[in-house]
Swiss-Prot record:
Keywords: ATP-binding, Cytoplasm, DNA damage, DNA recombination, DNA repair, DNA-binding, Nucleotide-binding, SOS response. Belongs to the RecA family. InterPro entries: AAA+_ATPase, DNA_recomb/repair_RecA, DNA_recomb/repair_RecA_CS, P-loop_NTPase, RecA-like_C, RecA-like_N, RecA_ATP-bd, RecA_C_sf. The keyword 4Fe-4S does not apply. It is found in: Cytoplasm. It comes from the Bacteria. Signal peptide: none annotated. It comes from Proteus vulgaris. One of its GO terms (molecular function) is ATP binding. The keyword DNA repair applies. This is Protein RecA. ATP binds at residues 67-74. SUPFAM superfamilies: P-loop containing nucleoside triphosphate hydrolases, RecA protein, C-terminal domain. GO terms for biological process: DNA recombination; DNA repair; SOS response.
Amino acid sequence: MAIDENKQKALAAALGQIEKQFGKGSIMRLGEDRSMDVETISTGSLSLDIALGAGGLPMGRIVEIYGPESSGKTTLTLQVIAAAQREGKTCAFIDAEHALDPIYAKKLGVDIDNLLCSQPDTGEQALEICDALTRSGAVDVIIVDSVAALTPKAEIEGEIGDSHMGLAARMMSQAMRKLAGNLKQANTLLIFINQIRMKIGVMFGNPETTTGGNALKFYASVRLDIRRTGAIKDGEEVVGSETRVKVVKNKVAAPFKQAEFQILYGEGINIHGELVDLGVKHKLIEKAGAWYSYNGDKIGQGKANACNFLKENSLVKETKNFNGC
């Protein structure tokens, strides 16, 4: 519907006043927004990148990754850092849990010499560091490990047993309001790792909840629920874990999709295992019983042998080009 001439003049004057007061680009028509094409960073998992819809985690947004202990939360974020560094991006790791293992990070492909790392004393300090790094415009990816370890200053200075009801939630709520806009302006990806707690007295429904209040749930553009679903064994020795990630919230594509992959201890996400599974799904690799074949040639009996074949052959490059990746 056409707008009459007087309204168009009034609108143009208002837009001009807003841009004069708040700067160019402070208001625009949605179709003119250059940020409509979302830039992403790979998670290090092909199947998870596909499940996310946009091809990875969106830049300029807040992402929450949560799950039980030893489910692969930190491993997944380290894989994101490795992928970002390969693209020449600058990354920072806020280690509130004081538990980051540089040797393990290096095994996953992280360039530890160029990874910024901070071990803050309080939750407020951690979030202020996040804000300072974001406002610098020079850091592309920031990881906070974890929300549960962001302890308010008042709680640290108090005594054990003192009540500090809602302190962490208020701290996170204030931080989210401050960080969200700065992250968008700087095009910085901020990933929070979070832990799971159980609600007391829940008779029906899911008793699980995450720490830090509700603010992070609202401000996060993507929320990933990561779970360990089984063990990978080499004989009697456990060498890794079967992992399932559910996209429980997604503001940049369709939510509620799932990805399954293997995490191998000391190696990270088993990319070759994903290539085998996705190759079978897209009918690039044939599976008959325990045997896997490519173009009529057998490449291995069992998934482990097929993975070894991919590691040793250039077939990996060809398989990466299947439709959907």
